[in-house]
Swiss-Prot record:
A zinc finger (RG N-terminal-type) spans 1-39. It is found in: Cytoplasm. GO terms for molecular function: ATP binding; DNA binding; metal ion binding; reverse gyrase activity. This is Reverse gyrse subunit B. Residues 316-465 form the Helicase C-terminal domain. Introduction of positive supercoils requires the cooperation of both the helicase-like and topoisomerase domains of the 2 subunits. The helicase-like domain probably does not directly unwind DNA, but more likely acts by driving ATP-dependent conformational changes within the whole enzyme. Transmembrane segments: none annotated. Pfam families: DEAD (PF00270), zf_Rg (PF17915). One of its GO terms (cellular component) is cytoplasm. ATP binds at residues 83, 100-107. Keywords: ATP-binding, Cytoplasm, Isomerase, Metal-binding, Nucleotide-binding.
Length: 575
């Protein structure tokens, strides 16, 4: 079945069929043939004076091939798919995170990328955790440089006093193309660095570099941001956290955009093995560079987010799938459960939609069927670590997401929580209604958690579940969390607090068999809906996310929190 889409031709932004989009071609008006490479299409459009946005696709493809050849010459191996994707992001001027375990090619990419851009007159700074790594990278990059014929100056700060003195002179004068130092050098010798502007900064093991919040500011200065701009961004972050004045937030966002627009700025590539970045100033990267260090994905997003009121959710879901076709993901909230996912999948099958419920324990072969379009949709639970949310990487297949109910956290006044994350979320939600001791304990607990590993937190959680004591610091943390859990439980069972919660525009309450507090799960919504959009050589594909809202108050809370992240929810047709 041929479907036509308005405003999505990759060349003229006009009307185009799904068949031509699948083939990677522009519309028939621009290019009348049924096949052709990016280069062939480019030449035809150019010769016939029809070349528009396809020029960007062609230029990116050309640069990618050039980089692949350069990489092969330097390393004697072709770059793998992730390294090619990282290059495309850098070429397009995006700052971004690389979250991957060691041995995945981050450092090799950093060195070859530095040489590639250094040859084109750009200035690159590579920051690593230790001086030993500085030496290793310097030796490695010189091998690569010889292979590709790189003659520009590469400076690395390590070695004996004479070598360090020579390096400092070159750094002070800015007489280099590529600089490699430890993060300790960045902290101790910023006066030498501060007059340099860098087109690209690659921060290897950003977790250790950013332990000093001052290094965040230093990196931003070196990328071309002024102190005024950085402070304005910090004011905006604090205002967003307060969540008190949307209009003031919008105005400050516009002011910040204008400041950033006037300043020359480079890009930051932040590599991390864990993605465990915490702290307020880290959020400066989101406001100034458009991404979060250590986030699951960059904030670059090309998704239309739509909501409509839920009425007959099965019928509405069926009608949407019939209109949108294959490539759909259907999500139900965690409190609806697997049973609801199975129920919806069964209803869709009864109405000639090829659908299956997909969750942990289901055959992985269902993914192959979905990828091969033997299935139209998968139905699962909207849980942040759920299989359908995190375990699907099929950007060429997934086109849209339907949320049958708003993703949320549900807290019951009948039972105490045992999971640390949920205890702290509930405590944070109730902190405005608690005494000073509660607030102080909550703040202390958050600071303590920053100091412990994931494994240690797991030990504390198990001790809470099994009612066991620990030793030392971890026991103090366990006691704090239990205090917060018990006090939170008391608060949500007080009628005066319940009345105040009912007046809160961002918290939904359910009265039935006891009181339930509902809070929107923003992270899961962003992660799940993000399955519908992907980066490709010409840009980012457009996805569609549709929410069937089952709670007006919860919807408004989600809308507000998404707005703070720069994501707008749009009302859809109620038909």
């Amino acid at each position: 079945m041929k479907i036509y889409y308005n405003n999505v031709c990759p060349n003229c932004s006009g009307r185009i069929s799904n068949e031509r989009l699948i083939k990677g071609l522009p519309c028939e008006n621009d290019y009348p043939y049924e096949e052709g490479t990016i280069e062939q299409v480019y030449e035809y459009l150019k010769e016939n004076n029809k070349l528009k946005d396809w020029a960007n696709i062609y230029n990116i493809e050309k640069a990618k091939k050039e980089f692949e050849e350069f990489f092969y010459k330097a390393v004697n191996n072709k770059p793998w798919s992730a390294q090619r994707a990282w290059f495309i992001r850098a070429y397009k001027g995006y700052s971004f995170s690389i979250i991957a375990p060691t041995g995945m090619g981050k450092t090799t990419f950093a060195l070859v990328n530095a040489l590639y851009w250094g040859k084109k007159g750009k200035k690159v700074y590579i920051i690593v955790p230790t001086r030993t790594l500085v030496k290793q990278l310097y030796e490695k990059i010189n091998v690569f440089a010889e292979r590709v014929g790189f003659d520009n100056i590469i400076v690395a700060y390590y070695g004996n006093n004479k070598q360090k003195k020579e390096a400092k002179e070159l750094i002070k004068d800015g007489a280099f193309s590529i600089l490699i130092t430890s993060n300790q050098f960045l902290s101790r010798n910023f006066d030498l660095l501060k007059n340099n502007y860098f087109d690209i900064i690659f921060a290897d093991d950003v977790d250790s570099i950013m332990k000093s919040s001052k290094n965040i500011d230093r990196i931003l200065y070196l990328l071309g941001f002024s102190e005024t701009t950085i402070e304005k961004a910090m004011q905006l972050i604090k205002l967003k956290i307060s969540g008190k004045d949307l209009e003031k937030i919008r105005k400050m966002e516009e002011q910040l955009k204008e400041l950033v627009r006037k300043e020359q700025r480079g890009i930051l590539i932040a590599a991390s093995a864990t993605g465990s970045m915490r702290g307020l100033r880290v959020k400066l990267f989101r406001e100034l560079l458009g991404f979060e260090v250590g986030a699951a994905k960059t904030t670059i997003r090309n998704i239309i987010d739509v909501y409509t009121e839920m009425r007959d959710y099965k019928k509405q879901t069926l009608e949407l799938i019939k209109k949108l076709g294959n490539g759909g993901l259907v999500f139900v909230p965690t409190d609806y459960g697997i049973e609801k996912a199975e129920e919806i999948a069964q209803y869709l099958k009864e109405n000639n939609i090829k659908a299956e419920a997909f969750y942990s324990g289901k055959s992985i072969e269902l993914l192959d069927k979905y990828a091969n379009k033997e299935l139209d949709v998968l139905v699962g639970v909207a849980h942040y670590y759920g299989l359908i949310v995190r375990g699907i990487d099929l950007p060429h297949v997934v086109k849209y997401a339907i949320f049958v109910g708003i993703p949320r956290f549900r807290f019951s006044a009948k039972e105490k929580e045992t999971k640390i994350g949920r205890i702290l979320l509930l405590a944070s939600t109730l902190s405005d209604y608690a005494d000073e001791e509660f607030k102080k304990k909550l703040n202390t607990t958050y600071n303590m958690i920053k100091r412990v590993s994931t494994g240690a937190l797991k030990m504390v959680e198990e001790a809470i579940e099994q009612n066991k004591e620990l030793d030392g610091f971890l026991e103090e943390l366990r006691k704090n969390i239990i205090y917060l859990r018990d006090k939170s439980f008391e608060l949500i069972n007080r009628e005066d607090i319940i009345k105040k919660l009912e007046e809160n525009p961002f918290i939904a309450l359910e009265r039935g068999d006891g009181i339930n507090i509902l809070i929107p799960d923003v992270k899961t919504y962003i992660q799940a809906s993000g399955r519908t959009s992907r980066m490709y050589p010409g840009g980012i594909t457009k996805g569609l996310s549709i929410i069937l809202s089952d709670n007006e108050k919860l919807l408004r809370a989600l809308e507000f929190k998404l707005k703070l992240l720069g994501i707008d929810l749009h009302p859809g047709s109620s038909s």
